[in-house]
Amino acid sequence: KGTFLLKEVYYRPDRVKNLKTKLNLKKIYPNMGWCDDPLSKKYNSLIKTKSNFHYEKMFRKDHKYDIIIVLDYNLKKPIPYKGSAIFIHLTKNYKSTNGCISLSKKDLLILLRLISKKTKIKIT
């Protein structure tokens, strides 16, 4: 629960072209992961996948993370076990997620055009 800024957008440049948004765009490469290991000092942040700690792969075979928006949840001075990798990402079927928000590619592309660095999302 809470109200969160939308921080930045990560995307797969080999699968997605010409994104239109006012948020910062960052490319996803094969060596990128998001640390979800509460024992790591890098908890809830982008890391290289050669880490000894557990992480979620950003460069995936499926299309789930072809485009993601990072929510400002537990990012500054992350508290272990409070939650990590809270994203808005792609889905085909709008099924529930493990704490994220999932949208169709069409809807996510529309959202990207409408949001700015001041946009907040309220999760209830």
Residue ranges and their predicted role:
Residues 1-98, 108-124:
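Cell wall/extracellular polymer interaction/catalysis modules
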Residues 99-103:
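Extended catalytic/binding region for NAD+/ADP-ribose chemistry, centered on the ART fold
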